């Protein structure tokens, strides 16, 4: 907004033009025009908003009614003036109904002019018995004031009030009828208190108050200023100060008094510094900032993003047990819309690493955010905003993310992907151990449910990466025919049960029925290595099969044995995703017509019957909330 347009209305003789003259002329003048031309007053150089004030004088004559109506419809705020009993009665009988008939929806400042002869008692009586009843009846009246153009009493305050009603509207903050702050105001200020309270002790120290002042008003708060604030709060709200620090009730009480006394500018300064709009919702551009992701790119958390999430974890781990329990998680997400929908759909917290009590560990916390950012970075951006990523001068919310290169299909020239998060599809026949592998990955040794998609960290070469394992059941195989799904997959884990002679044929047939799988790095694994190994009922045994594909022999793993080898296998998966060249299928051109791999489809026609179409809940999440956005 570049200007605030104030239309001054009222009956003839109430002093509309005199009020304008008193504002713009230093000396009292006897000759005042019947109506002033439109006057523009530039903003004060000391003002932070750079908004000029435009004053529109009007006449109440019936022959000027068309012009009056046109100007009222262009107004940002209406200054309605009366000066005696007759003009006061006309406020409710004519003027306010007239404004409503024009369909205008702007704030109104009610002014009694010519009040120089009123003493304090008479002034209070006027406000209580004349103005307050009108405010209660007509909600469009935002403020009222007693003025005198003759004595220049409250003239500057009148037009400041008109300006403030537009730039710093009181209606969204204050319920005039109930004389209390609105629930939305309390909710917004409570969230701001929560964001400023960095040590999570439910108190704002002098240092934290200073941080608030610097962020909102670009000025340091001296110890004297802080002491004055605390003293005022203690007077109006005894429980508002505790051990020299500000409590939430005190913070709310201080802002309530500011708004009640017409000093809502400071409260709006706080709200707008934290990206609140005039409707007290967070700005859409703050929740969903512009963030360009080109085709062939994916999004991960940046070091700044991880640092913020680490700080957040320790801030809310009140019992210092290295995990977030249900109460701590609830406190952390208290001032957001709740757990993100995609988190709920992914069956968090079971989707990540929990301790023996079922609480989210430090690694599990970071892993969950890593996975969700990979699938739906827009949700991550919104929740970084809700949780106050930018509060401590970390920069824009988009600084918490970084854009990385996707896997290039079947490109053996790419020796390494410098990424932190990889997606692995886990495929295999029924009961081959897919779910057991996922449970082992997130250290789920209890009876809790393991979702179809889980995430954990994997450390190799002194670097921590995050691996997302997504199980594809026999009813989910249609996803292997979707190009966007395959583009998202960084590594394909092909499992077979080494103790079941019919297990290997399933994944061998799969490579024929879905030839695009050949473009994805593959790792074969034989599960249940603690049981007797069986000869596979297939023309080519697994070791020879993988050799013909130019891949390493299957890794033998067991999730049940004491000598569990799955940890090393997860490292192998992550390494194969980061260094894909050695895991991409390679069939010599001259042998392409005679390899057993190419003959499999004719030898095992029954394999096609195993492949039905469907989709699990988890894959609905991935397909609809991730792939559709690519």
UniProtKB/Swiss-Prot annotation:
**Binding locations of Ca(2+) 1:** 197, 199, 201, 208
Query: Which domain of life does the UniProt lineage start with?
Result: Eukaryota
Q: Which Gene3D superfamilies match?
A: EF-hand, P-loop containing nucleotide triphosphate hydrolases
A GO MF label: calcium ion binding
Q: Which residues cross the membrane?
A: 599-619
Q: Report whether Repeat shows up as a keyword of the record.
A: yes
Residue intervals on the Mitochondrial intermembrane side: 620-630
Provide the residue positions that the database annotates as binding Ca(2+) 2: 317, 319, 321, 328
User: What Enzyme Commission number(s) appear in the record?
Assistant: 3.6.5.-
- Can you say where in the cell this protein is located? Mitochondrion outer membrane
Question: Where, in this chain's numbering, is GTP 2 bound?
Answer: 428-435, 459-463, 527-530
Which parts of the sequence belong to the Miro domain? 1-168, 419-579
The family classification in the record reads: Belongs to the mitochondrial Rho GTPase family.
Instruction: Name it.
Output: Mitochondrial Rho GTPase 1
Q: Native species of this protein?
A: Schizosaccharomyces pombe (strain 972 / ATCC 24843) (Fission yeast)
Q: Gene encoding this chain?
A: gem1
């Amino acid at each position: 907004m570049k200007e605030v347009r104030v239309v001054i209305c009222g009956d003839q003789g109430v002093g509309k033009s005199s009020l304008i003259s008193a504002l713009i002329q230093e000396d009292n003048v006897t000759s005042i025009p019947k109506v002033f031309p439109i006057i523009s007053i530039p903003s004060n150089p000391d003002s932070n908003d750079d908004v000029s004030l435009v004053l529109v004088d009007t006449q109440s004559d019936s022959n000027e009614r068309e012009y009056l109506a046109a100007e009222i419809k262009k107004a940002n705020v209406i200054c309605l003036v009366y000066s005696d009993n007759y003009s006061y009665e006309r406020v409710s009988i004519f003027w306010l109904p007239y404004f409503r008939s024009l369909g205008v929806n702007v704030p109104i400042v009610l002014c009694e002019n010519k009040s120089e002869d009123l003493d304090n008692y008479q002034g209070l009586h006027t406000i209580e018995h004349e103005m307050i009843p009108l405010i209660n009846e007509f909600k469009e009246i935002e403020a009222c004031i007693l003025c005198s153009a003759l004595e220049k009493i409250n003239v500057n305050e009148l037009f400041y009030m008109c300006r403030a009603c537009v730039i710093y509207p009181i209606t969204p903050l204050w319920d005039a009828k109930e004389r209390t702050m609105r629930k939305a105001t309390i909710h917004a200020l409570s969230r701001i208190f929560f964001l400023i309270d960095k040590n999570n002790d439910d108190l704002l120290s002098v240092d934290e108050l200073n941080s608030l002042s610097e962020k909102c008003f670009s000025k340091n708060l001296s110890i004297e200023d802080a002491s004055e604030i605390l003293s005022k709060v203690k007077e109006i709200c005894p429980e508002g100060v505790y051990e020299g620090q500000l409590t939430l009730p005190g913070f709310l009480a201080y802002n309530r008094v500011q708004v009640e006394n017409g000093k809502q500018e400071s409260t709006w300064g706080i709200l707008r510094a934290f990206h609140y709009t005039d409707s007290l919702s967070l700005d859409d551009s703050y929740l969903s900032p512009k963030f360009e992701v080109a085709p062939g790119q994916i999004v991960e958390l940046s070091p700044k993003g991880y640092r913020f999430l680490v700080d957040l974890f320790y801030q809310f781990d009140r019992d210092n047990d290295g995990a977030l329990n249900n109460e701590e998680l609830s406190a952390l997400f208290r001032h957001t819309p709740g757990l993100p929908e995609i988190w709920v759909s992914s069956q968090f917290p079971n989707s990540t690493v929990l301790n023996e009590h079922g609480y989210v560990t430090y690694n599990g916390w970071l892993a969950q955010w890593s996975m969700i950012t990979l699938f739906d970075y827009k949700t991550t951006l919104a929740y970084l905003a809700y949780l106050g990523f930018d509060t401590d001068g970390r920069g824009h919310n988009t600084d918490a993310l970084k854009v990385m290169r996707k896997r290039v299909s079947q490109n053996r020239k790419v020796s390494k992907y410098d990424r932190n998060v990889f997606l692995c599809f886990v495929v295999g026949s029924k009961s081959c151990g897919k779910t057991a592998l996922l449970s082992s990955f997130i250290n789920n040794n209890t009876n809790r449910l393991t979702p179809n998609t889980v995430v954990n960290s994997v450390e190799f070469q002194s670097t921590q990466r995050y691996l997302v394992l997504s199980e594809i059941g026999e009813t989910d195989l249609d996803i292997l025919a979707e190009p966007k799904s395959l583009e998202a997959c960084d590594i394909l884990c092909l499992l077979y049960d080494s103790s079941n002679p019919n297990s290997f044929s399933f994944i061998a047939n799969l490579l024929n029925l879905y030839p695009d799988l050949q473009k994805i790095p593959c790792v074969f694994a034989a599960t249940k290595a603690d049981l007797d190994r069986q000869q596979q009922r297939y023309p080519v045994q697994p070791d020879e099969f993988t050799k013909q594909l130019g891949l390493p022999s299957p890794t033998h793993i067991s999730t049940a044995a004491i000598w569990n080898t799955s940890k090393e296998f997860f490292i192998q998966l992550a390494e194969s995703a980061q260094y894909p060249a050695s895991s991409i299928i390679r069939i010599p051109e001259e042998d392409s017509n005679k390899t057993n791999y190419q003959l499999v489809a004719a030898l095992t026609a029954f394999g096609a019957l195993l492949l039905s179409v469907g989709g699990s809940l988890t894959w609905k999440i991935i397909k609809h909330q991730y792939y559709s956005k690519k």
